[in-house]
Amino acid sequence: MAEKFDHLEEHLEKFVENIRQLGIIVSDFQPSSQAGLSQKLNFIVTGLQDIDKCRQQLHDITVPLEVFEYIDQGRNPQLYTKECLERALAKNEQVKGKIDTMKKFKSLLIQELSKVFPEDMAKYRSIRGEDHPPS
C-alpha cells in the first residue's frame, strides 16, 4: 500500500516544483521567456494528468474533512491524529471509570440485598454459579 502513496508523493513533489518554477518565470516575465513559460505550463498539465491517474489507485482511501481544515489553517495534519488519540484515551478513561463505579455499585447492592433477602440472594447466587456471597 505504501508504494501507492510513494508514487503519488513523487508526482506531487514534481508538480509543486513545476509550480514554483512557473511562479519564478511569471514574476519576472520577459517576452523571450515565452517558450519556457509554455513548456512549464505543459509540464503542469502533464503533472495534473499523472496525479489524476494516481487517483484510481487510491479510490478506497478516505481522509477526514478535519484534516483538510487543519491544512487550511496552516496546522500540521499529524496534530489531528494526535488529538484524536488523546480524545479516545480520555473517553476510554471516562468509560473505565463508569465501569468501575458500576462494578462497585453491583457489589454493594448484592451485599445489601444479601442482608435483607438472604434466601433470595442465595438462590440468585446458585443460579449465577457463585458459591459464596461477595465481600
Curated annotation (Swiss-Prot):
Cellular compartments per GO CC: core mediator complex; mediator complex; nucleoplasm; nucleus; ubiquitin ligase complex
Entry annotated with the keyword Transcription regulation: yes
Family matches, as InterPro entries: Mediator_Med10
The UniProt record lists the keyword DNA damage: no
Keywords carried by this UniProt record: Activator, Nucleus, Transcription, Transcription regulation
GO biological process annotation, one example: protein ubiquitination
Compartments, as annotated in UniProt: Nucleus
Gene Ontology MF term list: transcription coregulator activity; ubiquitin protein ligase activity
Main location: nucleus
Function of the protein: Component of the Mediator complex, a coactivator involved in the regulated transcription of nearly all RNA polymerase II-dependent genes. Mediator functions as a bridge to convey information from gene-specific regulatory proteins to the basal RNA polymerase II transcription machinery. Mediator is recruited to promoters by direct interactions with regulatory proteins and serves as a scaffold for the assembly of a functional preinitiation complex with RNA polymerase II and the general transcription factors.
PANTHER family the UniProt entry points to: MEDIATOR OF RNA POLYMERASE II TRANSCRIPTION SUBUNIT 10
Quaternary data: Component of the Mediator complex, which is composed of MED1, MED4, MED6, MED7, MED8, MED9, MED10, MED11, MED12, MED13, MED13L, MED14, MED15, MED16, MED17, MED18, MED19, MED20, MED21, MED22, MED23, MED24, MED25, MED26, MED27, MED29, MED30, MED31, CCNC, CDK8 and CDC2L6/CDK11. The MED12, MED13, CCNC and CDK8 subunits form a distinct module termed the CDK8 module. Mediator containing the CDK8 module is less active than Mediator lacking this module in supporting transcriptional activation.
Family the UniProt entry places it in: Belongs to the Mediator complex subunit 10 family.
Name of the protein described by the UniProt record: Mediator of RNA polymerase II transcription subunit 10
